A protein has these predicted regions:
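Hydrophobic/small/kink-forming positions within alpha-helical transmembrane segments
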Residues: 70-71, 101, 155, 159, ...
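A residue-level signal for alpha-helical anchor/packing sites in multi-pass solute transporters
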Residues: 133, 137, 167, 191, ...
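Transmembrane helix-loop junctions and nearby membrane-interface residues
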Residues: 104-111, 193-196, 226-232, 254-258, ...
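Alpha-helical transmembrane segments of multi-pass membrane transport proteins
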Residues: 33-37, 68, 90, 103, ...
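12-transmembrane solute porter fold
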Residues: 19-35, 40-42, 51, 55, ...
Length: 481
């Protein structure tokens, strides 16, 4: 998934040395980004204790990173075309590394959130541009092997992140989870300047500044409103006025995108039914799925009183099951088809999320592990299905923009889901201190049930698919015609 607009030119002849080491360069950056995105969740209770705040109030530390990813991804393509892949990739890794150090040094929550925004902006440019360099370097006959090597860290990072985070917090300090990125980032910079090719677009499209302001301001304001709604920091009148402003900004972007020759996101692609169903259905589904990696460590540490390292270990089964599902997902789709898989699997995710509402201090660890395995198994099948379905009927010339839209919507839905899930938990917790374990467990149980219901209802969105949709992608036979 990339936000880069590639040219139609064939890849240039890269040297054997570049081909040998470029996948390592991109994989190193991806590992750093994926590790950081999962390592933070386990450390939230320790951060809260260090800053003297409640764990739920730190949702913005996670949401700000995801939101800046959503806003920054569409700009990455323009940056690479204008300034070149080597320079932009080096900037992105440098910004991510610097922001990681600033996170570790942050004296208060606002500074930590600001540093996380910078981290997200670096990550938003880092991976799309890295993938573009790989695509432009390798011919089609070698591209699959190169891309498979590059995405391995995307699978390993979520597996190691919670455990590494838990161990670092337990034996060192939560600040050290950010300092881990510094030596990796410095090593990546050395590799970039030695082995990263420098590609530029043949014809740079103008940057849609108006669209960027409208889309960025609207989504940021809406996410912020969801974040603070449960904290009662705004009266009803001000909240309604700001909500109306956020919706007006997004509506204005919709009008602007229809009229602009080079919009930030080409909304006309939503006329493609399979793309529309996959992205919209996936948006609603991820509202529930995206918040679980944040709420589960709170349940384990704050609610059940488990140490950070044990909480991290309990997150590993989901990542392991997700990797296992990757081996059979293609076969499942080939046998049952996209429509049946997405509808049934979405319901199973909802059921699994609801079952977490039964987890309490007396629940055997084996049962918690089993639920984690189920969650990872179903989530992996869902992401594989939605991500591939989105491009089933997209023309090759539109694939880059379609990927940009899908990537931005994915991050945006996770940001909104995190804010919404935390809002539900805070709403049920009320004025009860978050040191009251029984109250925290009860509030989180209510959040799980609400998110489970929302996720299950999102299965209805996939009814918009036809039985034969995606059959060619799934390898179920020749397309009808």
């Amino acid at each position: 998934m990339t936000g880069v607009q590639t040219t139609a030119a064939a890849p240039p002849q890269a040297s054997p040395r570049v081909k040998r080491y470029l996948p390592w360069v991109v994989a190193t950056a991806l590992f750093m980004e994926q590790l950081d995105s999962t390592i933070v969740n386990t450390a939230v209770p320790a951060m809260a204790a260090g800053f003297g705040v409640t764990p739920l109030s730190l949702k913005a530390v996670v949401a700000s990173y995801i939101l800046s990813l959503a806003v920054g991804i569409p700009v990455s393509g323009w940056m690479a075309d204008r300034y070149g892949t080597r320079r932009v990739f080096a900037w992105a890794v440098g910004l991510f590394t610097l922001a990681s150090a600033l996170c570790g040094l942050a004296p208060n929550v606002p500074m930590l959130i600001a540093a996380r925004v910078l981290q997200g902006l670096g990550a938003a440019m880092m991976m799309p541009v890295g993938r573009l360099a790989v695509i432009r370097t390798f011919p089609k006959t070698e591209l699959l092997a190169a891309m498979n090597f590059v995405i391995i860290p995307a699978l390993i990072g979520p597996l190691l992140g919670p455990t590494v985070g838990g161990l670092i917090v337990h034996w060192l300090s939560w600040r050290d989870i950010f300092f881990v990125n510094v030596p990796v980032g410095l090593a990546a910079q050395w590799l970039i300047h030695r082995y990263m090719p420098d590609y530029r677009g043949e014809a740079t499209r103008p940057l849609d500044l108006v669209g960027l302001v409208l889309f960025g301001a609207g989504t940021a304001l809406l996410s912020w409103l969801l974040e603070i709604f449960g904290e009662h920091r705004l009266d009803l009148g001000a909240g309604v006025a700001l909500l109306a402003l956020a919706l007006c900004l997004l509506a204005a972007y919709g009008v602007h995108a229809q009229r602009s020759e080079f919009p930030l996101l080409r909304l006309v692609l939503f006329r493609v039914r399979t793309f529309r169903v996959a992205v919209v259905g996936g948006f609603v589904t991820r509202l529930g799925i995206g918040v679980m990696p944040f709420l589960l460590p709170l349940l384990y540490q704050v609610g059940l009183g488990l140490p950070a390292w044990q909480s991290g270990l309990l997150m590993m089964p989901a990542a392991a099951a997700a990797m296992g599902m990757k081996l059979i997902a293609t076969r499942v789709l080939a046998v049952f088809g996209y429509r049946r898989v997405l509808m049934a699997n979405t319901l199973m995710i909802g059921v699994t999320m609801a079952l977490f509402s039964r987890v309490g201090p007396a629940t055997p660890l084996a049962l918690i592990v089993a639920l984690g395995l189920c969650m990872g198994f179903f989530n992996s099948l869902q992401f594989t299905s939605m991500n591939s379905m989105a491009y089933a009927d997209i023309e090759p010339a539109d694939s880059s923009m379609a990927s940009t839209i899908a990537s931005s919507m994915q991050q945006l839905s996770m940001s909104f889901g995190l804010a919404s899930g935390s809002l539900v938990a805070a709403w049920y917790l009320g004025a009860v201190p978050q040191t009251d374990r029984a109250a925290v467990v009860s509030a989180l149980h209510h959040a799980f049930l609400a998110l489970a219901a929302l996720t299950a209802l999102s299965a209805l969105a996939f009814r918009g698919l036809k039985p034969g949709d995606g059959d060619q992608v799934a390898g179920r036979g020749e397309p009808a015609g």
